[in-house]
Swiss-Prot record:
Protein name in the entry: Leukocyte receptor cluster member 8
Region (Disordered): 24-66, 118-291, 328-506
Extent of Low complexity compositional bias: 47-65, 412-427
Modified residues (Phosphoserine): 351
GO annotation, cellular component aspect: nucleus; protein-containing complex
Superkingdom field: Eukaryota
Assembly information from the UniProt record: May be part of a SEM1-containing complex.
Amino acid sequence: MAANVGDQRSTDWSSQYSMVAGAGRENGMETPMHENPEWEKARQALASISKSGAAGGSAKSSSNGPVASAQYVSQAEASALQQQQYYQWYQQYNYAYPYSYYYPMSMYQSYGSPSQYGMAGSYGSATPQQPSAPQHQGTLNQPPVPGMDESMSYQAPPQQLPSAQPPQPSNPPHGAHTLNSGPQPGTAPATQHSQAGPATGQAYGPHTYTEPAKPKKGQQLWNRMKPAPGTGGLKFNIQKRPFAVTTQSFGSNAEGQHSGFGPQPNPEKVQNHSGSSARGNLSGKPDDWPQDMKEYVERCFTACESEEDKDRTEKLLKEVLQARLQDGSAYTIDWSREPLPGLTREPVAESPKKKRWEAASSLHPPRGAGSATRGGGAPSQRGTPGAGGAGRARGNSFTKFGNRNVFMKDNSSSSSTDSRSRSSSRSPTRHFRRSDSHSDSDSSYSGNECHPVGRRNPPPKGRGGRGAHMDRGRGRAQRGKRHDLAPTKRSRKKMAALECEDPERELKKQKRAARFQHGHSRRLRLEPLVLQMSSLESSGADPDWQELQIVGTCPDITKHYLRLTCAPDPSTVRPVAVLKKSLCMVKCHWKEKQDYAFACEQMKSIRQDLTVQGIRTEFTVEVYETHARIALEKGDHEEFNQCQTQLKSLYAENLPGNVGEFTAYRILYYIFTKNSGDITTELAYLTRELKADPCVAHALALRTAWALGNYHRFFRLYCHAPCMSGYLVDKFADRERKVALKAMIKTFRPALPVSYLQAELAFEGEAACRAFLEPLGLAYTGPDNSSIDCRLSLAQLSAF
């Protein structure tokens, strides 16, 4: 059994190279050979071992005795000694355990021997074999030689997760051996199916064995083995044991020290690590930089005089240092002679501090470039050179550079934002970013990204406490989890609301920024701010003549009334003496001719001259009372309302006048307009002296009868109205008569005499009563229609 293992090691070596070389020929990948000279010696030795192993294979098929076993033991020992030459070669790439390029299976496990994971072989033998003797375990545990005949079937380890691709059947020369598992994650595409090369070998009973062709010189194996599609980011943390075969693949894991669930590097960036360099695994942490480079960065930020200079310097340093660390020149440059960025480079467009209304760059941060260490812990290892420790950490050495990380993506150049946008994803296939709304870029849409508005106040810069980076929120294991969840209905609504474009948004931002772009102090107002309430000329209202008081010089007694739209001319305004003469003239003209149009125009002209000159005296009260009486007599209640409103204001200034009379008129006017609110207010401010006034007492009694629906008392009071109260009651007397008529028709049966109705509703005569009843469409009865048929007229009550 041990001999079989030794034969497996030798044949696997040549088979692997035959397989890969065949794949390279098929794909047309003829690359120049760059290999160690020791490989050629190894292949020659292994070729001879393979031939002797093939000769001993026929004896194995007929006899499994100790002679064959001893032969294979010697072959295994020779293979193990050959392998020891390359064990140190693997160690320079920091592999903790021997590296296996292929599947970790013993070739002859299937003949009854247990596999590495305790599983039986995929096919059995006619004669079950016993496990190897304990003395051969050391040989089995020696580092394996890369390569194994893929035509031999195997059983996949139980710890491996199944691949997304189903198992591929073997080619016809190997039809008896079917793969029982999918390709291992991270292996080359050539390992997912059998090679179609010529198969010339000897048979072990029903099983066909292919002697591999000598590999063609070409590119080294680990440079040709690219990961299968969809498997570059997968990785499994299989428990490793010393000197045990592992399932690591150079195509998917460039560094043996990677954690099983750690961030994965890009396979295309790490497949060219054939040259040994001490800085092949660069880190973005300043602790890993050369001392000259650290001093250079400090000099750059020390030379900055303002925050804008720091922003510009930070942006330039990101470009320079990132390129130098990637190509390795950062360790060879004399940084003490390197000029500062501002001395040799022109300021890049948009290099000053970005305005907060400008959209930020939509570029995604590089994969693996945003893993920030938390609490000064160990930095997360990334495959991208110079991008492993790009984030800021509390209390780390970034404070030496002015709290600026020169490797952060230029997502926002504002120095006031302490936590920049960083990659919160855990795999290379996600590009979600998390940015705070207090960054200078107000919104950034990259693909399907949406940056919600959230926290406003940035954390204090340069503080090392636990609350200095509250925007990071969750731990390393939880970071980015919110992006992995499916968006809920509420979040979709919020995102839709954020994505709504406001056409005025940019204009508003520019106006808002224009107010703060100049840092000058606010100038104090030399004069107190006065709110002008008189600027209503455009709306058609009268100007405030209190500010335009003049003394008129016009001697004219009569003057046409015109609305003023500008400052009044004193030559067109009459003084008080002339206005008194004009008022007497208007009174006489009204008594003689009853020309309301002329009287109203002259009264309004007098009122205007008084207002322009700011005259509010006893004469002003007389003018308004005269105009109110003329309007009442003519029935112009609009003009009366203007006059009584001004009279109420003048009476409040304790100017003498007919206060009781016009208070009664005001109460009756409120009854006419059915303004119960103003009536209640007026009643509340009535003094005892006013209540004792005859006009006010009459108005209060009339209001009580109106409120109670007592039409009999109402019309009795109407007939005995003092002064000019009757003119106001005339405005709503017919309305109250209809209400009273409805009540009478409902009450009186079968007929209602017209004579009784005339007396009860306070008509002056029967003719006036008939004129009132005629348009109502009532039914009459009796001789000469002297009575109203209440039963027939009941249907007409709804019409009035």
